[in-house]
Amino acid sequence: KSYPINIKKICGEIEGLTLESIPLKSKGLRGIAVLSKDKSDDDIILLNSNRDACEQNFDCGHELYHVAFHRYAGNTFNCLENVKPCQNKFLEWQANEGSAELLVPYKLLLPEIKKSYCTLKSYQGIQNFIYKMSKKFNVTDSVISIRLDDLKYEIFQYVNGASLNDVKVLSDKRQKDDGIYCISLIDMREFYRKKEEKKHKFHYYNSCKADINIYRS
């Protein structure tokens, strides 16, 4: 499948699925999936039309995952900005991961990272890469940032010589259980940001000292 993909368009072509975008007024509500109890009725996905096209595309993937894989767990799923105590955190995490993998597959993202790896040695370099990938896959910057963080172990393997087919995809819990600890590109972005901020402050301090010395002389 060519990328970027329009999940809303795909959902609109699925028989037995009704998709609508409406202005949802509840705070933080991004979408709703209503699963039919009877095969004669359509499943329904409602998206918040107050959100932009990229956000709705991701939300649609999230709700579609509920429709496809979580029928056993209930009839209605609300996609909220922050998961509430009454929601199943694991199912919401699964739906987010499913939408992210559908829109930004790791087998397409990892080669892009390796190709640009030499430019990812500064805060701005990583920021530029995130922006470039968000345009390539038609997602928000935050989706790419989360992918870079979640796929840190997979990225480590690939840039160090593993083939795409040999890359092991492990959850954070499995990595911790196996004693695997990797630094993500998002961790490095924060490191570079602080380093560059400190460097800027140092130069500013020296500049101020020079101005004071000139004034005294």
Language-model-detected regions and their locations in the chain:
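Active-site hotspot residues in diverse enzymes, especially metal/ion-binding acidic/histidine motifs
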Residues: 1-217
